[in-house]
Amino acid sequence: MAIKKQMDLLGVIVLGLTTAIGGGIIRDVIIGVIPPSSVQDTIYAKVSIATSLLVFLVAYIYRDRPIKYSFKLVYNNLLLVSDSIGLGLFTVVGINAAYHRLNSPGFFLLVLVGVVTGVGGGLVRDIMAGDKPYIFVKHIYASASILGAIVCIYLWDISGQSIAMLAGTSTVFLIRFLAARFKLDLPIIQGHNFKE
């Protein structure tokens, strides 16, 4: 996104970093982890910065070369799969953090921190880039995180942490992947009465 918006190297890094750790920071503030864990353990920040630098470098090298359709197809599918897995993992990691930090966290709080961990960084990134947040306009994204969080929470006490987290991640992945693959969206109201 930052490259398409013609942001410089710092902009690419900041948006990449925001996407990677923004949701976790919001989650930690909600559950009372101060300073947030993602700024105490810098592995996520380091991986995000390295990835942003690599993306910037590749985009710079290939900036004027035509991109073949087959490459775009492979890239888009790889991005979809990795994004779907990442959304699922971040969602259940957020729930896990709340379970370990709080005594008897309520259902709503668990869903909230799971979803915020999953989509919060991207939401903040889109706002910083001046776009409508992707999670509200494109494919089923936050909804997949919500459903995966519900599955994870429901199974947590029944089948244990590991199975619950695997099932939650799998649910998010499956819903997200199928929604993107088949262009499924939540309904919106369209019409001349509702245009900006």
Give the positions of each predicted feature:
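The feature marks the first
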Residues: M1-A20, D28-I31
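Cytoplasmic-side transmembrane-helix entry/capping segments in multi-pass membrane proteins
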Residues: G11-T18, I43-K46, F71-G86, I135-A144
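Helix-coil boundary and interhelical linker segments in multi-pass alpha-helical membrane proteins
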Residues: V29-V39, V93-L109, Y154-A164
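Structural signature of hydrophobic alpha-helical transmembrane segments
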Residues: S38-L53, P105-G118
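Loop-to-transmembrane alpha-helix initiation sites
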Residues: Q40-K46, G106, V137-I146, I158-T169
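Short, highly charged, low-complexity non-transmembrane loops/tails of multi-pass membrane proteins
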Residues: I189-E196
